[in-house]
Every structure is written in C-alpha cells, then in structure tokens.
Amino acid sequence: MFYERLEARWRTPLANNVYDGVLFGVAALGSLFSQRNTTITELHLVESARSVLDLHQISEAPSVDLVTGWVLRVIYMRMTASPHSTWIASSTLIHLIEASGLHLEPFDDTVFPQHNLLCDPDIRRRLIGVAQHVNMWTSFDLGLSRVALQSPPLAPLASKSDDYTTELLRLLPISTNLDPVKTEDNRNLEPSLRQVLSGNHTQPPSVLAQCNLVLCILRRFGTVGFNMSPTLAEQVLALLNDALRSARFLAKDCSPWHHVANVPFHIICMLLVLDTRSSLAMLPEALQTLELVASIYDTDAMKQAHSAACLLIFLHQQRRSEDVKIFRDVLQTQGQQGSG
C-alpha cells in the first residue's frame, strides 16, 4: 500500500495532501538510519513533515494518514529531540488517536463515521501500540503524566515473518502496570520480572526494550527491600549482558534506537546497586559500552552521562575503601589485644 501511494504521488507532483507527512516521515527515518551526521536533506524532510502535519487543521476526526504521520514524527523525535518536546508531541499523538476513534474496535450500532473501518485492523493496533510505547516511556523517564486511552487492551498482533514489533508491544501491559500513579501490589513485581525475563526477544532494539523494563522493575524492588534469589539474579545479569552487546551493535551499525544511550547508563547504576561480585565484574564492559556510545554520538548529554557513571563508580570504590579500612582497624586492634 505504501509503495502504491508513493508511486501515485510521483504521478501528481502538484497535489498536496496529508499523506505527504507520511512520505516525508519515512524518508527522514531512512536518512537517520543511513548516516551518522544529520544532513541538510534530512532537516528539510523533518521540517516538511512537520509543516504538512501542522498545516492540516483538525476540523473533524483526524484521519488515519494524519495519525500515521504523527507516529513517524514522534518516533523520529524520540531518537533526536529533547525528552520534553518528545513528551509533548507523543501526548498530542495519543489525543489525536483518541479523537480519531482508532483505539476503539469497530461496532455496528452507530450512525457516526468510523475511521477505524478505513484502516487495516492490524496496522491500526500497531499504530496505537507504538504511540503508547513512546508516550509511556518518555513520561516515565521524565516523571510526568502519560496520556491513557480509555479502551480495552490491544488485541494480539498478526504474526508476520521478519516483523519484531510484536516483541516490543508484548511488553506494554506490564509497562502500564508500572505507572508511578498506580498502586501496584508489590507481590506482583516478582511474577512480572520473571515474565519479562522469560520473553523471547531476538533483535537488539527489542532486547534493549526488554532490559529497560527489567531495570524499571528492579528500581521498584529497591523501594520494598526485595532480595533476589541467586537463580533470578543470574538471569537478570545475563539479560543486562545481552543488552550491553545489543547497544554496542546498534551504535556501530548506525542504528540510533532510543534505548541505546540510556540503557547502558542505567545498567551501570543497577550493577552498583546489586553490589555482588558477579555484578561488579560486569562494570568494565558496561562502562566501555557507554564510552563507545558517547564517542559515536558525541553530544553534551552523552558526555555528562559518561562522566556521571565514572563518578558513581569512583564513589562506590571510595566507600568500599572506607569499609576495608574499618575491617583493617578491627583486625589490628584485635591483634594488639591478643599480643598484649
């Protein structure tokens, strides 16, 4: 369908409609994943997409094309823009979905137009799921409110070969339950952790999303004083190791998925919190991964993240040195008493 509409657009170069925002959005993402440095062409594509979407004033329910264009815009912003601007855009997107009615399953007993009938059911669910994923995690990162759709949970996506969106969207229900405004029963945290760890995630972006959710659950554990079993801790460390490997692969592959930067930093923090010999042994690889990402994506934020990680490790070492001094003093005192 996309290529058919693209070909039709080339045949009518003077035409202008909202689907141009989709075409510009796809081209901008293609450019982002094709080269490390932003080009003038990419900036023009992004600005053209923004102009098309903003110029189509909403006088009625938003169309599927408008929502699709906004999904692409928000995906691009999640990887390139500031968190606050991405949060605002993703919140707007959820409101557009609600206004369009795409989040509702089609029903017969209505006289009102239903845009969800004009969209393939599987594509509709994917649009909604990706929009929720970006809005949810951007709001979680900032500690701000997410926009919740008043609708039943998404139906399962159709299984397709070489399609990994299903892996990502399977994480949505548990992610929703971790909303800070929810009073989640702490007894559900361990089953949720085990469920996420048992998920089959085959592609690096999906592995990073899985790891990001596990890190969120572990941080919630920290507030209730939960002690992991050795077996569960081993599974967690194995996933963290896979996530570091995935982050390095994506960074070298010019694939700036939005978790490439933040997950390695949060892994370092979690390794220090776990504070076991096995977790601390992973620190060199974790810091090297963060350093690699910072060298490839040479931004102030990445430099600050790398510096902060080094400082945290130094402070942890300093605390350990002070602990060792206490033990040494105790033994020296005991030795002096014994010789006396």
Ranges and model annotations:
Residues 82-96:
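Classical protein tyrosine phosphatase
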Residues 4, 8, 47-52, 94-199:
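Fungal transcription factor middle regulatory core
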Residues 97, 177, 185-201, 231-340:
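Fungal C-terminal regulatory tails
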Residues 37, 83-87, 104-108, 138, ...:
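Short, flexible/disordered secondary-structure transition segments
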Residues 42, 46, 67, 261, ...:
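Core helices of alpha-solenoid repeat scaffolds
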